[in-house]
Amino acid sequence: MADPKTAAVGPLVGAVVQGTDSTRFLVFSSKTAELLSHHKVELTQEFPKEGWVEQDPKEILQSVYECIARTCEKLDEMNIDISNIKAVGISNQRETTVIWDKLTGEPLYNAVVWLDLRTQTTVEDLSKKIPGNSNFVKSKTGLPLSTYFSAVKLRWMLDNVRHVQKAVEEGRALFGTIDSWLIWSLTGGVNGGVHCTDVTNASRTMLFNIHSLEWDKELCDFFEIPMDLLPNVFSSSEIYGLIKTGALEGVPISGCLGDQCAALVGQMCFQEGQAKNTYGTGCFLLCNTGRKCVFSEHGLLTTIAYKLGKEKPAYYALEGSVAIAGAVIRWLRDNLGIIETSGDIEKLAKEVGTSYGCYFVPAFSGLYAPYWEPSARGILCGLTQFTNKCHIAFAALEAVCFQTREILEAMNRDCGIPLRHLQVDGGMTNNKVLMQLQADILHIPVIKPFMPETTALGAAMAAGAAEGVSVWSLEPQALSVLRMERFEPQIQATESEIRYATWKKAVMKSMGWVTSQSPESGDPSIFSSMPLGFFIVSSMVMLIGARYISGMP
């Protein structure tokens, strides 16, 4: 006889959430959407040169195995039988590019992360090759030609890494985003691993036609990418293969969504016009536009939101992407030492409740939506001798909110219907100062689920609803209602407008710091960090000097 506790939880669904900073595995009840257990492993990032961001694909894969094993151990300690886990879904950082040897299973190069800027020259060279129609790439993909997306990262590897070139020439190479690498590895790797991706991840490569839902030969020819490198493209909800090793051997992987699309599903934004904003390493605002592609005139991306079944239609979204959100907190901790833990920033910001006229533009990787300005770099301005680390912490949080407002305004103009409230999720939403700031700066309510793991929930829902699994219903009447916390604006709209206008002045000052130069003329990245570094160092000198002159301790 089954243990009563085991019997009560019913069918379970697991979700791998593979992000830039960490990997997690979470297990949900398919009947109640209750989170039962989870485990998290933090990841390292490598910065070999200024503007380069890499990760080790093997470390990422190992972190997935570790998270699954540890979560299953925790379930066992709770007297929950892991045989109740009927499916696993995958949610992943998008655009990050992996290329590996299908004969050995070894990566041919580190994963080039979505934030990476090394391909700026590649982008400039490609932009000169665009056929007569300047909208050639965007009309097919919904994306601007940018360092952000996978095609240019793969092109760079093919141009610059000899053993990648050799593996491609010999027919040994496979390309994929992180989901492809994980699914191929988990389903057997060199022993019959499934080389696939889903439509949401494919739509971020700049090689995928979002209208026909196929790899586009014209795009592959333009980027000179051999099509035999590319994974098969499936829907976001179907059985791709079975896990071949570990605690969940034999369990199907049946859901796959890029992380921001998974959060849209997890927030249950299934109706046209519903939107969510995820606060993670970056910040990503997505609005469901239904079954039609809406092309932005205000700097937003058009992307595939989800396709929840082989025979189901694809749904689309408008997206605004901010490169640096949670990453700025990591930078304050690791580079400046202003905080010791990520949680300290809330305490510092709360201590002063204002930036004291200090504005921070964290354009470490240029500016994404709505500017798409790769020449921008981070600046800290409005400093006085009274500015301290608390004001800088507050300005860093405020910067995330200002960037969100810029995207929301662009989205309102494209959609024609202003959002009445903003649904939010992601790790940074645990910061109550940030959430209140966001409501104040947008001047609309911000609504946050008490269970913040909506990205994982979306991946689990897609996996559990797949044909052949069918333990999770996506019918509106069957969807669980998430308990929400609401943040109302607490300042006058005029104050919000003044602060926002000043922020936009700071953004203008951040642009134009980097220009293309040949390698012989020097490394432009040396100068790219000058504005922010100069302001910080000079302000510290001013503070020390002022204290010395005034006789302050």
UniProtKB/Swiss-Prot annotation:
Primary location group: mitochondrion
GO process terms (BP): flagellated sperm motility; glycerol catabolic process; glycerol-3-phosphate biosynthetic process; sperm mitochondrial sheath assembly; spermatogenesis; triglyceride metabolic process
Gene3D superfamilies reported in the protein's UniProt record: 3.30.420.40
Binding site for substrate: 20, 94, 148, 259
Pathway where this protein functions: Polyol metabolism; glycerol degradation via glycerol kinase pathway; sn-glycerol 3-phosphate from glycerol: step 1/1
Enzyme class: transferase
GO molecular function: ATP binding; glycerol kinase activity
Catalytic activity: glycerol + ATP = sn-glycerol 3-phosphate + ADP + H(+)
Family: Belongs to the FGGY kinase family.
Protein name listed in UniProt: Glycerol kinase 2
Annotated organism of origin: Macaca fascicularis (Crab-eating macaque)
